[in-house]
């Protein structure tokens, strides 16, 4: 099992990256909450990882924090929640925001995430409620303000919007829905990562 990788960031196209680890290129899928914290192309980064083995593919998921990976592993234990849906959940909410929604039983927030219907949201509440009691109340509202500006991502509004739409579709949103989400928040000065962040925030 690959649990942690440290290497040079070669490519990033939300939600995927290519990481060079001693000459070997690893393709990883990251939730957007981890993607926001990536350095610029060519710089070193360290990610906690989880490998999912399927008949048709081996998928490697990366996380900026160990707590993100822990929640990912808890999510995929839930009936009806696969790795891609867990990725969408962690892209829409930070660990703290998700924990708060679970402890407050906020079904409406959970069902706004693509792929999470009422039954899935109810299962998440039943199976995960109480597992976040160790998290302080103040921690529920912690939100990273760091948004890296990467020269590898074209800041032109049309290019940023197209990349943001593609990323949202990859996370499970329907094309029409993704386009509407991006149009509501897109500004010429925003990078694609910033557009995605604002679109996901507005969706909740």
Curated annotation (Swiss-Prot):
Cellular component GO terms, alphabetical: cytoplasm; Holliday junction helicase complex; Holliday junction resolvase complex
Entry keywords, A to Z: Cytoplasm, DNA damage, DNA recombination, DNA repair, DNA-binding
Region Domain I, annotated ranges: 1-64
Subcellular localization: Cytoplasm
Pfam families: HHH_5, RuvA_C, RuvA_N
InterPro entries documented for this protein: DNA_helicase_Holl-junc_RuvA_I, Hlx-hairpin-Hlx_DNA-bd_motif, NA-bd_OB-fold, RuvA, RuvA_2-like, RuvA_C, RuvA_C_sf
Region (Domain III): 156-204
Single GO MF descriptor: four-way junction DNA binding
Biological processes annotated in GO: DNA recombination; DNA repair
Matches recorded under Gene3D superfamilies: 5' to 3' exonuclease, C-terminal subdomain, DNA helicase RuvA subunit, C-terminal domain, Nucleic acid-binding proteins
UniProt region (Domain II), positions on chain: 65-143
Keyword Cell membrane in annotation: no
Chain spans, region Flexible linker: 144-155
SMART domains per record: HhH1 (SM00278)
Top-level taxon: Bacteria
Domain free text: Has three domains with a flexible linker between the domains II and III and assumes an 'L' shape. Domain III is highly mobile and contacts RuvB.
HAMAP family according to UniProt: DNA_HJ_migration_RuvA
UniProt record similarity statement: Belongs to the RuvA family.
Role noted for this protein: The RuvA-RuvB-RuvC complex processes Holliday junction (HJ) DNA during genetic recombination and DNA repair, while the RuvA-RuvB complex plays an important role in the rescue of blocked DNA replication forks via replication fork reversal (RFR). RuvA specifically binds to HJ cruciform DNA, conferring on it an open structure. The RuvB hexamer acts as an ATP-dependent pump, pulling dsDNA into and through the RuvAB complex. HJ branch migration allows RuvC to scan DNA until it finds its consensus sequence, where it cleaves and resolves the cruciform DNA.
Subunit structure: Homotetramer. Forms an RuvA(8)-RuvB(12)-Holliday junction (HJ) complex. HJ DNA is sandwiched between 2 RuvA tetramers; dsDNA enters through RuvA and exits via RuvB. An RuvB hexamer assembles on each DNA strand where it exits the tetramer. Each RuvB hexamer is contacted by two RuvA subunits (via domain III) on 2 adjacent RuvB subunits; this complex drives branch migration. In the full resolvosome a probable DNA-RuvA(4)-RuvB(12)-RuvC(2) complex forms which resolves the HJ.
UniProt name for this protein: Holliday junction branch migration complex subunit RuvA
UniProt source species: Haemophilus influenzae (strain PittEE)
Name of the coding gene: ruvA
């Amino acid at each position: 099992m690959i649990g942690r990788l440290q290497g040079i960031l070669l490519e990033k196209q939300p939600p995927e990256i290519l990481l060079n680890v001693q000459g070997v290129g690893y393709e990883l899928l990251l939730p957007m909450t981890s993607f926001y914290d990536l350095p610029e192309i060519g710089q070193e980064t360290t990610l906690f990882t989880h490998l999912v083995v399927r008949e048709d593919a081996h998928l490697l998921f990366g996380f900026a924090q160990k707590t993100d990976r822990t929640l990912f592993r808890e999510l995929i234990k839930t009936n009806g929640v696969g790795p891609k849906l867990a990725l969408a959940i962690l892209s829409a909410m930070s660990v703290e925001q998700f924990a708060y929604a679970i402890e407050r039983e906020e079904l409406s927030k959970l069902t706004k995430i693509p792929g999470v219907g009422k039954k899935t949201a109810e299962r998440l509440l039943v199976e995960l409620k109480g597992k976040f009691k160790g998290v302080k109340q103040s921690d529920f509202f912690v939100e990273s303000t760091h948004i890296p500006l990467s020269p590898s991502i074209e800041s032109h509004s049309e290019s940023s919007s197209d990349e943001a739409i593609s990323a949202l579709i990859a996370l499970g949103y329907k094309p029409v829905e993704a386009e509407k989400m991006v149009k509501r928040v897109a500004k010429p000065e925003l990078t694609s990562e910033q557009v995605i962040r604002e679109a996901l925030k507005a969706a909740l």
